[in-house]
């Protein structure tokens, strides 16, 4: 078995489907099946059993997957160590970043960091903050940038702090909200709770949900076309949107805030590249209150 086989087993275990594994590896299903049969022949085992939808790994298959994960981690650790021996900052930086931060902030940051350290390559995985948290816990990424609060055993530092706003095409008042169409969007549990709690406290009746869309950016476009109002964090608002915005306050009269957190393992600071990136982020002074 080599690195390609380790990756194959790891992804197959994640997907529990030969078809989806082939799609992720950009190869054909027959070639995946052929390689899996070769692995089974080498060890004289069955890796998995087929079921109506997908597959189920055997005990022997689970053992080989665990071995593949260990070998991939050892290989990555070796690559990191060798890169770290160089006097210059170089190597492969593995980042897990929440979708919103990745869309609105990350490109500019990576461009600036790449200008400072041109010999750095990036592996960036984006998604819900809960998914990024799983990547951190599994050691798949070295640095996580997450929205909202999460349990983390390592270092956790606030990177940004922003206000939440009501957004609409034209000026509106809080008293009008129960009678206006509300555009809801899918988001992580922490932001969803903040918004729902505020509405429960400040609106005399439940909002009229006109539609529910998949992303904040889609929601914002609907609002820009006058189809309703919504509540959004400052990170996604631009002057060019030409939207009416109203800050939200809690019962104590303080602005409702949305935090973005920088998370990493303390041991990762021993890697020049990771330390350089973390120091760079801290030097950006992105925290706003």
From Swiss-Prot:
InterPro entries named among the record's database cross-references: LysR_subst-bd, Tscrpt_reg_HTH_LysR, WH-like_DNA-bd_sf, WH_DNA-bd_sf
GO terms assigned for molecular function: DNA-binding transcription factor activity; transcription cis-regulatory region binding
A Gene Ontology biological process term: regulation of DNA-templated transcription
Pfam families the UniProt entry points to: HTH_1, LysR_substrate
Boundaries of every HTH lysR-type domain copy: 1-58
Tree of life domain: Bacteria
Disulfide bridge map: none
UniProt entry tagged with the keyword Transcription: yes
DNA-binding region, residue range(s): 18-37
The entry's keywords: DNA-binding, Transcription, Transcription regulation
Family: Belongs to the LysR transcriptional regulatory family.
Protein name, as recorded: Uncharacterized HTH-type transcriptional regulator YraN
Organism, scientific name: Bacillus subtilis (strain 168)
């Amino acid at each position: 078995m080599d690195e390609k086989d380790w990756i194959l087993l790891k992804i197959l275990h994640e997907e529990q489907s030969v078809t989806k594994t082939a799609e992720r590896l950009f190869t054909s299903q027959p070639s995946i099946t052929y390689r899996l049969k070769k692995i089974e022949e080498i060890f004289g085992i069955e890796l998995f059993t087929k079921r109506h939808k997908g597959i189920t790994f055997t005990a022997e298959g689970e053992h080989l997957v665990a071995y593949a994960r260990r070998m991939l981690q050892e290989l990555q650790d070796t690559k990191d160590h060798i890169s770290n021996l160089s006097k210059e900052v170089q190597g492969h930086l593995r980042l897990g970043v929440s979708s919103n931060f990745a869309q609105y902030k990350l490109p500019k940051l990576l461009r600036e960091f790449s200008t400072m350290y041109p010999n750095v390559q990036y592996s960036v995985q984006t998604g819900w903050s809960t998914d990024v948290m799983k990547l951190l816990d599994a050691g798949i990424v070295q640095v996580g940038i997450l929205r909202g609060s999460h349990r983390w055993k390592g270092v956790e530092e606030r990177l940004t702090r922003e206000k939440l706003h009501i957004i609409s095409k034209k000026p509106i008042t809080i008293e009008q909200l129960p009678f206006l169409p509300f555009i809801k969007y899918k988001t992580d549990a922490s932001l969803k709770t903040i918004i729902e709690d505020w509405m429960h406290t400040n609106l005399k009746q439940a909002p009229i949900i006109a539609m529910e869309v998949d992303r904040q950016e889609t929601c914002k476009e609907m609002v820009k076309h006058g189809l309703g109002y919504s509540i959004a964090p400052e990170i996604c608002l631009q002057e060019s949107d030409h939207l009416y915005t109203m800050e939200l306050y809690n019962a104590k009269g303080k602005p409702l805030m949305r935090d973005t957190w920088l998370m990493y393992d303390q041991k990762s600071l021993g890697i020049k590249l990771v330390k350089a990136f973390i120091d760079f982020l801290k030097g950006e002074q992105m925290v706003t209150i």
